[in-house]
Design a protein with these regions (language model features):
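Amphipathic alpha-helical dimerization/coiled-coil segments
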Residues: 109-141
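A short, conserved structural fragment
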Residues: 82-93
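Short acidic, hydrophobic short linear motifs in intrinsically disordered regions
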Residues: 55-66
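Short, locally clustered residues in the helix-turn-helix/winged-helix DNA-binding domain
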Residues: 47-55
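Short amphipathic alpha-helical interaction segments
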Residues: 68-83
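Short, cationic-aromatic polyanion-contact patches
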Residues: 35-43, 59, 92-116
Length: 141
């Protein structure tokens, strides 16, 4: 799965005290939520499951029940969160076979965000190498 994040110039939301409003705005800034989605949307509520219950290991079946939606919808939005690289996968034995679980890395969004920053740094370094290579190609003509 490829890492994906929208990077946009912004002002830190440190003056806001409503955690849901901060989360909603933040998720729109990074491209997880579209501009029209609100806190009652499935994508926001899915992210909120992880954010507000960081130690809980969620199975897809549990998320389906919690969000009152289909597995396909849960997986569609779960894959967007996984693309940010902030979730860790686990397994839980349930009957005959183990089922995957998901939770915020280290049970802490701030710590999980270090993975995002590392991926951004790597991507920017790779962009820089490509720009340098392109400039050399242009100058060689």
């Amino acid at each position: 799965m490829s890492f994906e994040l929208r990077v946009k110039k912004n002002t830190p939301l440190t003056g806001e005290t409503d955690s849901k409003l901060v989360a909603e705005t933040f998720l729109k800034l990074i491209g997880y939520l579209s501009s029209g989605e609100k806190v009652n949307s499935i994508p926001f509520r899915l992210f909120a499951c992880f954010l507000f219950h960081p130690q809980k290991e969620w199975m897809v079946d549990e998320l389906t029940i919690e969000l009152k939606t289909t597995k396909a919808t849960v997986y569609r939005h779960l894959n967007k969160i996984k693309a940010l690289d902030i979730l860790e996968e686990g397994k839980i034995d349930e009957g005959k076979k183990a089922k995957k679980t998901y939770k915020i890395r280290y049970g802490n969004l701030k710590k999980a965000w270090n993975f995002v920053e590392a991926n951004v740094e790597l991507a920017m370094n790779n962009y820089g190498e490509t720009v340098n290579h392109l400039q050399k190609l242009v100058e060689a003509k």
